[in-house]
Structures are given as C-alpha cells and as structure tokens.
From Swiss-Prot:
Topological domains, Lumenal: 29-371
Known EC number: 2.4.1.-
Protein name, as recorded: Glycosyltransferase 8 domain-containing protein 1
UniProt source species: Mus musculus
Keyword Methyltransferase: no
Classification of source organism: Eukaryota, Metazoa, Chordata, Craniata, Vertebrata
C-alpha cells in the first residue's frame, strides 16, 4: 500500500472520530438543555422552598395546591367573601382556601360559599381556638378591631395548615386583581420564613397618625424607651412592613419556631408594655417586626397596594388602582362601610349574602333614605 493511501485512510478515520465526538457532545448538550427547561418551569418565577443542592420548582397552573389563609369574622364576612371571589375569578391555579373562623360563624359562612359562583371553590373551614391567646393579649378598648382574636390567626399558620410547605396569608379587606400564582411564587431567600411588602416601597404612601409622625418605621410601632426593646439593637429608623398580606415558607417557619417567638413577645408586651403608645395599626405588627427584623424577603409592592381605608378620599389614580395586583383597604374606612374610597372597585367582587344577615351599610342607608 502506497504512503499516499495510508495518509488518506488516517485522514478519513480522524474525520469519522471527530464526527462521533461532535455527535456525542451534541446529544449531551441537548439532554442538559431539556433538563434545564423542565427544572425552570415558568420563566422568571422562583422556587417554593430553598433546599441546598436540590432542584427548585416554581408552581405552575393546576400543579401544586396553593393554600390561601384568610380570617372570617361574622361582622366582616362580606369582606372575606369578596376577597375569596376575587382570588377565584383571577386564577386557574389549584387554590385551597383555609378560612379561619369560629363555630358560631361556620354555618353562615358555609351557606354563603355554597351559593352562586363560589360553589366550585375548594375550601376548609378552620375553627380558631381563643385559648391560644390566653395570657398573650392585653385588653385595650382603644385598639378596637385590632384586638379581635381572629387578627392573630396569622401567627399560627403551621397549626392552621399543618401539611403545607408554603402558604399565603391575606386580610379580609383586600381585593386580588392579579393571578395569585404570581404571589405564591414570590422568591424567599434562604433562611427566610416569610416575605412582606415594606412600608417604604414605591407603591406605599406614608401615613400620618395621631401627631406621632410617619408610621412607616420601627419607632412607630415599638416603645424605644423600654430597655428590653433597646437591648435588641434594632434601628428605630428601620422600615416597617405590612403583615396584612404575606407569603410564608412554613418549613422554615417551623424550623425557626416563629410562632413560639411571636408568643414570647406577646407575653412580654402584656407584662411590660413594649408597643408604641401611639400605635394606630394592628397590634399584630410589633411582634412580627421584632421576630422578622432584617430576616424577611419582600413581595412585589403591587401585591399590597394599601391605605385605601385610611381615609374616604382617593389617594391613587384610577390607572394605578387598575394596575395594582392586590388592593388593601387597611384603616377605618372599609369598603363595606358607610364611606370608603374605591368602593365601586371592591363591590364588583362582592356577592350578596343569601341569608340576608350581612348587608352593605351604605346601600342600606341609601334604601332607608329613599323610603
């Protein structure tokens, strides 16, 4: 065999070997890309829980159950119904509502839920045991609504939804305009048990209360004259957050014994009066601020556009209200009351009580005036 033929054979074998290696690498890359796509799920969304060296999966429509916890007080039941309806109508996800109430309200609530457009929702009615609060809450007539037992349901999420790894909590004075799936997929940093909307965010406005200045930082909620508070070395100017809407990593919540920590500060407040004397917001906020100081993630501010109930006037433009993912009527002017801002927006989601026990106050007043 001539030297020329040997060179040709060697060259052909080299080309074949190169093509085989290239083909193998292409198959490996294709497999890797396929795995990456399946692990990523919905673009831009983050995992439920952080687990070191493990794949992380955001929830997609109709995949994993999304637990939504909301309280149902007899005198505010219309708010709960409107909030649930707004969530239900704006998502195709597998939502399970955990509605926290008392046995005395359960039948009324059930009859409302089983009528009309809410027949198809999935829900569980959970009775709240007030014994949980014994020795932890100091009765103060000036606090009004914030002293009601169901206000503290948010502290006991692992008890209310024991099998869930993650959950959303929301107050009864909200309307959801976005897909709750997006809120549920809020990314929580490693070691964080909850994500809140901070009061200094761009979608919030600073509220003036009782001459105490702007209640958007820690000094507006805690009494920094008390030694126990000072010993915590928390900056008084730290931005506070709103606990009316939040996402909780319940695995991390349990690991850190968050409920026990909250109860500890509730008891200490009863004994020592640690909360600010000018406190205008919910008394659930101070213990949460202490426990989650610099240890919480944040939700998109458009998922808690608040202060709609701070006054009867309109503080936001119609365009901004329409763009909001969640509207929050925190404050004294509730959308089912005599006067409220953007009541027409809230009323789109309200379903009249089939039993007639609950009625909108302003509508009742209008009827009385006509008569």
């Amino acid at each position: 065999m001539s030297f020329r033929k040997v060179n040709i054979i060697i060259w052909v074998l080299a080309v074949v070997l190169f093509l085989l290696v290239l083909h193998h690498n292409f198959l490996s890359l294709s497999s890797l890309l396929k795995n990456d796509i399946s692990d990523s799920g919905i673009v831009g969304l983050q995992p439920i829980d952080f687990v070191a060296s493990a794949h992380q999966h955001p929830v997609s429509e109709r995949q994993e159950e999304i637990p939504v916890v909301i309280a149902a007080s007899e005198d505010r039941l219309g708010g709960t119904i409107a909030a649930i309806n707004s969530v239900h109508q704006n998502t195709r996800s597998n939502v399970m509502f955990y509605i926290v109430t008392f046995n005395s309200t359960a039948d009324h609530l059930r009859s409302w839920l089983n009528s009309g457009s809410l027949k198809s929702i999935r829900y569980k009615i959970v009775n709240f045991d007030t014994k949980l609060l014994e020795g932890k809450v100091k009765q103060d007539p000036d606090q009004g609504e914030s002293m009601k037992p169901l206000t503290f349901a948010r502290f006991y999420l692992p008890i209310l939804v024991p099998s869930a790894k993650k959950a959303i909590y929301m107050d009864d004075d909200v309307i959801v305009q976005g897909d709750i799936l997006a809120l549920y997929n809020t990314p929580l940093k490693p070691g964080h048990a909850a994500a809140f909307s901070e009061d200094c965010d761009s979608a919030s406005t600073k509220v003036i209360i009782r001459g105490a200045g702007n209640q958007y930082n820690y000094i507006g909620y805690l009494d920094y004259k008390k030694e126990r508070i000072r010993k915590l070395s928390m900056k008084a100017s730290t931005c506070s957050f709103n606990p009316g809407v939040f996402v909780a990593n319940l695995t991390e919540w349990k690991r850190q014994n968050v409920t026990n920590q909250l109860e500890k500060w509730m008891k200490l407040n009863v004994e020592e009066g640690l909360y600010s004397r000018t406190l205008a917001g919910s008394i659930t906020t101070p213990p949460l601020l202490i426990v989650f100081y610099q240890q919480h993630s944040t939700i998109d501010p458009m998922w808690n556009v608040r202060h709609l109930g701070s006054s009867a006037g309109k503080r936001y433009s119609p365009q901004f209200v329409k763009a909001a993912k969640l509207l929050h009527w925190n404050g004294h002017f509730k959308p089912w009351g005599r006067t409220a801002s953007y009541a027409d927006v809230w009323e789109k989601w309200y379903i009249p009580d089939p039993t007639g026990k609950f009625s909108l106050i302003r509508r009742h007043m209008d009827t009385s005036n006509i008569k």
